[in-house]
């Protein structure tokens, strides 16, 4: 995830692969934490092999051929969820090999965040990652120790784990270890700050922004939250704003989804039809 993903091809490919990951992790018995660890391992494998990156991003090879190569190489070595995610990544189009590595790392973080969500640690994960990033940034000695590439990766990972022992969730420790041991050209504190944004995005997806013409009662908010939770398959928190201009009805936004049932919108649509 070091560096920005290409805004065009890479962004679309990442989004498609994340859908595959989400579906895989929704399966009964799927281990999101282990899947994240496996995807981090694949990221390291891609980073260490220019030939592998080129093979999986070669536009002259079909997506099916690249998918078969991934299955032949990694089947049985990583979780089924990680395997299908890497297959989706390899089958997609990429502008550069680095984009593939960045996307794989991003989805590794998403998998760990998913595990934190399931464990009820999502809020703690965001806070703990942020605080640890600030601790590292504020300590030149610690910052230099975690940036020392002459030290073995395992030693830097162990240092991060010791600092968080008994003070943080397992998912925080997992991500801190990875950030500390990463050799991807970005300091640990900067990686952690990027990953805080991934957690924040996941938390944002769990919030329904509701605009109503009049205030909702507590009972109405609870019913709305329950309905949305059933629809999205996860707990939804309702944030309510009041806008009398809506006249009646609700406008609900959850992530990129917008459900507009306001009377003002219906009236506007009716006017457009009449004018057309």
UniProtKB/Swiss-Prot annotation:
Purpose: F(1)F(0) ATP synthase produces ATP from ADP in the presence of a proton or sodium gradient. F-type ATPases consist of two structural domains, F(1) containing the extramembraneous catalytic core and F(0) containing the membrane proton channel, linked together by a central stalk and a peripheral stalk. During catalysis, ATP synthesis in the catalytic domain of F(1) is coupled via a rotary mechanism of the central stalk subunits to proton translocation. This protein is part of the stalk that links CF(0) to CF(1). It either transmits conformational changes from CF(0) to CF(1) or is implicated in proton conduction.
State what protein this is by name.
ATP synthase subunit delta
What does the UniProt keyword field contain? ATP synthesis, Cell membrane, CF(1), Hydrogen ion transport, Ion transport, Membrane, Transport
> What cellular-component terms does GO give this entry?
plasma membrane; proton-transporting ATP synthase complex
> Self-association or partners: how does it assemble?
F-type ATPases have 2 components, F(1) - the catalytic core - and F(0) - the membrane proton channel. F(1) has five subunits: alpha(3), beta(3), gamma(1), delta(1), epsilon(1). F(0) has three main subunits: a(1), b(2) and c(10-14). The alpha and beta chains form an alternating ring which encloses part of the gamma chain. F(1) is attached to F(0) by a central stalk formed by the gamma and epsilon chains, while a peripheral stalk is formed by the delta and b chains.
Extract the InterPro entries matched here: ATPase_OSCP/dsu (IPR000711)
- Family the UniProt entry places it in: Belongs to the ATPase delta chain family.
Q: Which PANTHER family match?
A: ATP SYNTHASE DELTA CHAIN
Q: How does it sit in the membrane?
A: Peripheral membrane protein
Q: Does the keyword Ion transport apply?
A: yes
Q: Source organism lineage?
A: Bacteria, Bacillati, Actinomycetota, Actinomycetes, Kineosporiales
């Amino acid at each position: 995830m070091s560096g920005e993903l290409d805004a065009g091809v890479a962004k679309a490919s990442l989004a498609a692969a994340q859908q595959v990951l989400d579906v895989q992790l929704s399966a009964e018995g799927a281990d999101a934490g282990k899947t994240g660890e496996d995807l981090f391992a694949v990221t390291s494998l891609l980073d260490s092999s220019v030939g592998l990156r080129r093979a999986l991003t070669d536009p002259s090879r079909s997506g099916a051929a690249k998918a078969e190569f991934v299955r032949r190489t990694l089947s049985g070595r990583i979780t089924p969820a990680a395997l299908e995610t890497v297959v989706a990544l390899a089958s997609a189009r990429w502008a550069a090999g680095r984009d593939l590595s960045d996307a794989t790392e991003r989805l590794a973080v998403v998998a760990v965040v998913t595990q934190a969500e399931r464990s009820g640690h999502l809020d703690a994960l965001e806070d703990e990652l942020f605080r640890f990033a600030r601790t590292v940034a504020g300590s030149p000695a610690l910052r230099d120790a975690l940036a020392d590439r002459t030290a073995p990766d395992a030693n830097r990972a162990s240092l991060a784990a010791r600092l968080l022992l008994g003070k943080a969730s397992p998912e925080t420790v997992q991500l801190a270890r990875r950030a500390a041991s990463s050799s991807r050209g970005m300091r640990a504190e900067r990686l952690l700050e990027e990953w805080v944004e991934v957690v924040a995005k996941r938390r944002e997806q769990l919030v329904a922004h509701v605009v109503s013409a009049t205030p909702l009662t507590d009972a109405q908010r609870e019913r709305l939250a329950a309905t949305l939770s059933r629809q999205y398959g996860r707990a939804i928190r309702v944030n309510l704003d009041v806008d009398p201009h809506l006249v009646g009805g609700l406008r609900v936004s959850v992530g990129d989804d917008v459900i507009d049932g306001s009377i003002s919108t219906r009236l506007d649509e009716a006017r457009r039809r009449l004018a057309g």
